[in-house]
Curated annotation (Swiss-Prot):
Record GO terms (molecular function): ATP binding; tRNA(Ile)-lysidine synthase activity
Gene this protein is translated from: tilS
Protein name, entry field: tRNA(Ile)-lysidine synthase
Binding residues annotated for ATP, in chain numbering: 31-36
Record's subcellular location: Cytoplasm
Family: Belongs to the tRNA(Ile)-lysidine synthase family.
GO BP terms, alphabetized: tRNA modification
Catalytic activity reported: cytidine(34) in tRNA(Ile2) + L-lysine + ATP = lysidine(34) in tRNA(Ile2) + AMP + diphosphate + H(+)
Amino acid sequence: MHFLDENIQIKIDKFYKKNSLDKNRVIVAFSGGADSTALLLNLKYYLSNNVIAFYFAHFIRSDNEQNQEIEHVKGFCDLYNIALQIKKCDIDIKSESARLGVSIEELARKFRYIALENALKENGANYIALAHNENDQIETIIMRFFQGSFLDGLSGIPSVNRNIIRPLLEVSRLEIENFLSLNNIGFFVDSTNAQNLYLRNRVRNNLLPAIKKVFKGYEKCLKRISEFSKEFADYFGKDEFFPVEKGKYYYSFDLKTFLDFPKYLVFRLIFKILNSEGIAAKVSYKALNEAFKVEINRKKNNVLLKTNDFFLEKRHNKINLIFKRDEKFYKPFDFILEVGKWHSLSLGKILLKYLECNAASVSRLKCCSYEFRYKFFKDRLKAKKFFSKFIRCNPAYLMLLALDNRLIGIIDLNTLNLVWSEKSILKKINISLIGGLLKE
């Protein structure tokens, strides 16, 4: 194929060299639209045809339009001799988004990324190429600014994020349109682009024209903000300015350091941890900020924030960020645990490493799950009142410890914390839980 405009090729070459990327196989997220069409053809040329076009059908538009787009994509790849793979979403995104309380846009993106990751592995490719351009970057920064993003967010869309690359971030929408026009290349126009159904469309169609009238050359200013924000984020990402104790399913912070540190850096660290666990998008700055309005310095232990994936608690002189484990394979248990011996549970393998009771000869304990709680109480009402103290804990993770049929301790298997003990009997205990069917 002969390119009448070499500008995009030059920028792609610069992008590859700047990020030290090899020229191995790439999965190109192809929608048939202008941006992904320009990306696909330019990468095909640049990588000597070592590309696979991947199309994901969300079916969030009408079936008629979706099928027309699929036919266009097939015809286009046939015309330019490009390998094509099509994946149709097997989930009703509209109804599922309503059930989960998330936007259609967010859920569609999630399933699309999952499909792309699968295609990457199945085809032995090195990268997934997305067609975000310079204008998308500007729109993203503006959206994040008005959503109260941290400086990390104002750095914009990353050009390289693990195996995801965006070679067109330095290419404007006008350059893309000129490239397609000069080469007489057709593309599919999504009918929703001109509608204000989604936030990005409203920013593009309504907000940006108003900003352009008032602030001439705002694009350069936003680009500068993005560059400075990225430098800031990279600098604070190099070293751990905040001491953190990391366990398998938790992060623990010293309370005094936590309170003395600038709130921005504390929040940034929490979001960084959540992002590494793949759940940052589910937590808003507002929710986190509200959590810290609690009188956190008071003596009483309390839960600051609780979600379906984790909870943030103040316990003694620590702030703990604790992730929930997979309950899918949970089964009730009732067994004897001896010091130095492993026992297999549905939640994992457990080891009693150390035990100190009022009687030195004690080396084993009766251990049972929450379902057996009533056998330690003659009165069920008293049992209910007693266990109401542990309402913040998930019952599936409570392990009851007994000696001579007397309840002497309760351990939260999610955190391995001793949440209650009969101190006159149980002095110290150390338990380890590994492997099993836990979510790694």
